[in-house]
Structure formats: C-alpha cells, structure tokens
Amino acid sequence: IIFQNRSGNENVIEIADNSFSKSSIEEAILTEGFKYIGLNAFSDCKKLHQVVLPVSVEEIENSAFENCNSLKSISLPMLLKTIGDAAFKGTGLRTLDIPKSVFWIGDDLLAECQSLEHIKIPDNIARITDRMFMNCSGLKKVELHEKLNAIGERAFFGCSSLDFIIIPDSVQQIGQDAFTGTDDMFIVQCSFGSFAEQYCRKNKIKYQLV
C-alpha cells in the first residue's frame, strides 16, 4: 500500500493509532509529508516485509511495528526525533541504524528480536533503556560509545549469543539483571576502577580489565 499525503496541509500528518494493526498488509510505502506513526499503527502485521518512511517522519510511537516478524530491515529517516516503547519489539530486524537526530528512545525497543545480530549505539543516545534488547537470542555484537552513561534493567537479559561487551568509563549506572541469561562465556571488558568493574564484582560477572 502506498500512503500519499495529498491534503497540502503542512500541519502534522499521521498514520493514526491502530490504523493497520493485525492486518494482512505486506508493504507500507509512505510519501513525503507524514510526520507521525501512531501507537500500534502496524503492530502484529505478520506479513509486513517492507516499510519505506519519508524524511519527514519525526516520531514513531509505542509498539508501532511490534510483532511484525517478517520485517527484516528498515531505514529510519534522518529527521526522526523519538522512537516509542517497543516500537520494533518482536520484529525480524537483523540490525537497526538509529539516526543522530534521535534524542529519545523508549523501553523494550528491540526486545524479542531473535534475528538481531549487531547493534551500534550512536553517541546521541545517552542511555540504553530498560529491556532494550531483552531476549534477542541472536545478538552477537554490541558497540557502545564513550558518552554512554547508563544501561537499563534487563537491557541484555536473555541475549544468549552475546559473549562479550566493552563498557566505557562514562557508564555510571547499570540496572538489575542487565546481563542475566547471556552466553555462558560472557565477559565484560572495562577499565580498572570503573563503575562497570564494581558492578561486575558485586554481581559476580566475569570481567577483563583493558
């Protein structure tokens, strides 16, 4: 389906809440002018495999694409500002490039994405949110930046393929069970005297000083 903005109205143009939830839609191509993807707009669309978002999209609401398990990839627009809770939870995404324009992301963003293999956190994101990657059983590589300050509760819970992560000195908060259920050989690489080292010692997590 091609969604066209023909109104000529420069105010917020949206895909309304629950518009296509649980439908059999296979493709969603939005033309320029749309700014808002609503709550549950495309959630549980099991056949949805292609989504094209225009540069004009600024906000993706909670659960907008949740459980779209045929969705293997998506390109996020360069003017995007916020991504809501569980927006891509349970999708088939293998990776996700978050634009530098984004200043807020919600909890559970990519939870239950079992095909997710690699993620790089851009330096505009200061915090890995609660359960952001929970039960991403295929996740093998995570790249964190030197400005990151927090890792939320259960952020990597159940990431059974993740065997190491490098935590920068900038991180001053790590939530409960952040790394529970990772690979049996999982090890944190961190600096001597860092918060990450203290967290690992307290929670009996293997670590290596670098």
What are these regions (language model features)?
Residues 202-204:
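Short, structured coil segments at secondary-structure junctions
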Residues 1-14, 23-36, 46-59, 69-82, ...:
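Structural signature of tandem-repeat unit edges
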